[in-house]
Amino acid sequence: MITLAICYTINPNKLGDFKEYVAAELGPIRHSGGNILGYFLPTDFAGPTNEALGLIDVSDLAAYEKYRKALAEDPVHKKNVARLEQSSAVLATNRILIQRFQER
């Protein structure tokens, strides 16, 4: 199992727009083969207010490639991305693939 970690730098004044994007993306992500572990938003009481994180599991690298292709072709995803870009809620995105450490 590998996890796609999507690290977002967001405009804290556009948090509502980002939340709408995340809610709208849950369906396309699942439909494309991603298992959503969760989206995590900044808090008002600790840490930076402009960072968010999405964690999505896929079984292996081949499944990740299939997921990325299916998501890129999804018409709802395309609309969501266009709406997000228009809102300027996300300033930067960084994607990394990580694996869970499992103690033996």
What is the meaning of each model-derived region?
Residues I2-T9, F40-A72:
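Short, well-ordered beta-strand segments in beta-rich or mixed alpha/beta enzyme
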Residues E20-G38, D57-R95:
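An amphipathic, aromatic/His-enriched active-site/gating alpha helix that lines ligand/cofactor pockets
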